[in-house]
UniProtKB/Swiss-Prot annotation:
The keyword Transit peptide does not apply. GO terms for cellular component: cytoplasm; microtubule. Its main location: cytoplasm. Its cofactor is Mg(2+). Pfam families: Tubulin (PF00091), Tubulin_C (PF03953). Some glutamate residues at the C-terminus are polyglycylated, resulting in polyglycine chains on the gamma-carboxyl group. Glycylation is mainly limited to tubulin incorporated into axonemes (cilia and flagella) whereas glutamylation is prevalent in neuronal cells, centrioles, axonemes, and the mitotic spindle. Both modifications can coexist on the same protein on adjacent residues, and lowering polyglycylation levels increases polyglutamylation, and reciprocally. The precise function of polyglycylation is still unclear. Some glutamate residues at the C-terminus are polyglutamylated, resulting in polyglutamate chains on the gamma-carboxyl group. Polyglutamylation plays a key role in microtubule severing by spastin (SPAST). SPAST preferentially recognizes and acts on microtubules decorated with short polyglutamate tails: severing activity by SPAST increases as the number of glutamates per tubulin rises from one to eight, but decreases beyond this glutamylation threshold. Residues 430-449 are annotated as: Disordered. The MREC motif may be critical for tubulin autoregulation. This is Tubulin alpha chain. Keywords: Acetylation, Cytoplasm, Cytoskeleton, GTP-binding, Hydrolase, Magnesium, Metal-binding, Microtubule, Nucleotide-binding. Tubulin is the major constituent of microtubules, a cylinder consisting of laterally associated linear protofilaments composed of alpha- and beta-tubulin heterodimers. Microtubules grow by the addition of GTP-tubulin dimers to the microtubule end, where a stabilizing cap forms. Below the cap, tubulin dimers are in GDP-bound state, owing to GTPase activity of alpha-tubulin. Mg(2+) binds at E71. GO terms for biological process: microtubule cytoskeleton organization; mitotic cell cycle.
Amino acid sequence: MRECISIHVGQAGVQIGNACWELYCLEHGIQPDGQMPSDKTIGGGDDSFNTFFSETGAGKHVPRAVFVDLEPTVIDEVRTGTYRQLFHPEQLITGKEDAANNYARGHYTIGKEIIDLVLDRIRKLADQCTGLQGFLVFHSFGGGTGSGFTSLLMERLSVDYGKKSKLEFAIYPAPQVSTAVVEPYNSILTTHTTLEHSDCAFMVDNEAIYDICRRNLDIERPTYTNLNRLISQIVSSITASLRFDGALNVDLTEFQTNLVPYPRIHFPLATYAPVISAEKAYHEQLTVADITNACFEPANQMVKCDPRHGKYMACCLLYRGDVVPKDVNAAIATIKTKRSIQFVDWCPTGFKVGINYQPPTVVPGGDLAKVQRAVCMLSNTTAIAEAWARLDHKFDLMYAKRAFVHWYVGEGMEEGEFSEAREDMAALEKDYEEVGADSADAEDEGEEY
């Protein structure tokens, strides 16, 4: 089997984890106690779900996941919640005191006390796998645990499991909706540390998701539950190909091969369609062409940036539900002719397509309508550099005055790490700029040296 281990770090990671595993269980017909009714009609005898669940002798299905937080309250909710019997108690790991939005606490002081325990749990999960293909790490950029502990964990995973792919789902600090003042510091420190260890990172911007909830689902004040359920649909679409048999199947390494042209340029933009409330869906057709077009609307993206200002390097469309290749090809052909989609000149306009016949599942009582087909587009575009630029600007404003830096230094960091991280981010922005430049321009520059 091609197993994946999910690691959920910090409050954001754990809460997204709750939403994701709730959805996986519904999709595979697994009850909250881990039992799967024996009639097997739901999965149709398809055992691909074993990539995400391991089965015990008693027929209980246990998620291949670890939940880690440096303070107990969030994971305690899992321990007492609906799905408390689903997880092995050892998979829920908590510390005593939290990282207090401080990268240095998550990475150095408090993180190092718990890291060996976490790695031991991960090793136990890895031992149960016959052919582990990689890790999915869920975390936020802004929090102390999400930024600091994740970067520590990624470094250690690279040492212990060097060849395995590591994919991240990272919550990018929203431009307007901020939960901590020091988010720009944490984000840039964690990006710098994790850059060389992560193979592919899907960023999710809370504000973009807020707007989608407000605009498409008519939720006036979206809660984190609303956001997480939407995020879990996207994660589910990305991982569906690993969990179900489909016509065109995609595995973890295949994503990287198709989306990451250079090791550092590994931040694809995710777009999901249709996000629509039940009363609207009733009156709309939502054909393959409709949902494919919707993917190219900046309004449906998970990060606020404008791909019309950037260039595409790669594009991957993952359909699920009632979709036939003929419709997909027609939809893509139309888009290629009329859209203002610019590909970089060194990459011919290739769209990679995955089709999965399992229709999207919705959480009962949730906000999304039950639809026959959905699509998730992953595109590697230079426009995402806008997101980095925004973050770097905020970092600069604070760091120019050395605001809040003493909290980090007090936990054993050196000020040099800040400037080093900031330089790395500047280099990343420059990388994106160069990748988007036409290859002809680049050659002229070369002659001057």
